[in-house]
């Protein structure tokens, strides 16, 4: 790989809300810099998963190195693409830490949206040079003057020289490249000679093993070096090869130098060994201090995943193991359920992360699976002072020994057109939200700041927000603190037998309505038996809702033609005794559709 003067290197990222054209602009930049040959070009080149293309989102960060001749000088432009969704905000923050600048892409028709706002604030915290770009200016609904004013008023960026572009037609792309070179500062010349490299991602390749994506801050990294991860402490690894993204990961000779972005492979066994945000240094001459900002990624949302056919358990285990190779944030623990059999308790960064894993298992491994209702981590403080972290209703202790329960809360920003304000306030009130402030984004739109329990967000908040705002509302959230809450375990009993798959942890105020809706749904989906089946929702053995599935009645007197009524009475009495015995010893078979229908309530 050609060596570049550090002042000719530009590391930048692209910040955009879902569907504002981030991947398409990346495509145009690759075309304009001749990084990709025309015959290899396709839409959303950096989005390698089918799921990313279909949903129009970036799930996994994809770096790429471009070379560009500008005013007689050759520049190396490193685009460190980032996932846009709030679930992956820590990965976004680490990717932004590897950059000196960012393009803020805003749809010229839709304007500023919640997730682009959240990521802009992350970039501002890291003192990045932000270049505002208005995309889709070829749309009839585009209003560049109003949207530019919105960016200036709410984000505080100077939009005097805002770039208007259309990724579809290629208009404005040369202006973006010029702005990257002129406005994004080059990497700072290192003050020390020891190797310091920021890990901003990792990828498992079936042929070469784990590839660690790094941005070199100081020192040099080359094949044969022995390196250590400073946060992991302990193990030393030999670098077996280094490479760059041209745009595909390509092995190179020589070394990775300060300011450059690339990857290395070493004798690493598991993705878990590589932590995003960690600092790589040499084992013999280590850096004195690691780079700032590292933290462990912990799952926020938990759900059980079970195969519909129990014989698929080993296939599901293999599928989750393979997905975990490329996703260190996914946690897996084997568990068993009385009603669903053997499965796994999985931890995710958020609801989108859960949906993506669920969909990939179905698509890539052709498995039929059930996911239990998503849950969060509650802190249960016992009377003896011990604190338990509970993410599964089955682990909830006896209420008699509980002092109190604390639940996680989040800070939420909602952007909405003005006319839907009352709808959103009613929705947030129903979700136990606390309004912090309301601000005007422009003449037509508002920004609402709320505090909400995380449990209310992970169920159906996004769907309901889209519903009450006719699709125009958007939101992002960040984790806040734990607060005391009246959280209780709701049990569902079928024929007086508790069914663990339907149990859930809910707020006391919502327990009755939740219990009633589960009972009503089960009455519709469980087939009738020859005996009466009671369906009950209970809290601490006290029934709060009940429905009954009526028995199938067989006409036992069909063969009696007229005659004495006592003969009929004997047959009815015999039937009654049989049904009583059946109720005591009969088993209710619950179809898989019942589990799926109840989970749809979430």
Swiss-Prot record:
Domain of life: Bacteria
Residues binding GTP, per UniProt: 19-24, 135-138
Database matches in InterPro entries: EF-4, EFG_III/V, EFG_V-like, EFTu-like_2, LepA_C_sf, LepA_CTD, LepA_IV, P-loop_NTPase
PROSITE patterns associated with the record: G_TR_2 (PS51722)
Keywords noted in UniProt: Cell inner membrane, Cell membrane, GTP-binding, Hydrolase, Membrane, Nucleotide-binding, Protein biosynthesis
Classification via NCBIfam families: lepA, small_GTP
Function, in words: Required for accurate and efficient protein synthesis under certain stress conditions. May act as a fidelity factor of the translation reaction, by catalyzing a one-codon backward translocation of tRNAs on improperly translocated ribosomes. Back-translocation proceeds from a post-translocation (POST) complex to a pre-translocation (PRE) complex, thus giving elongation factor G a second chance to translocate the tRNAs correctly. Binds to ribosomes in a GTP-dependent manner.
Protein name: Elongation factor 4
Native species: Chlamydia pneumoniae
Record lineage: Bacteria, Pseudomonadati, Chlamydiota, Chlamydiia, Chlamydiales
Gene responsible for this protein: lepA
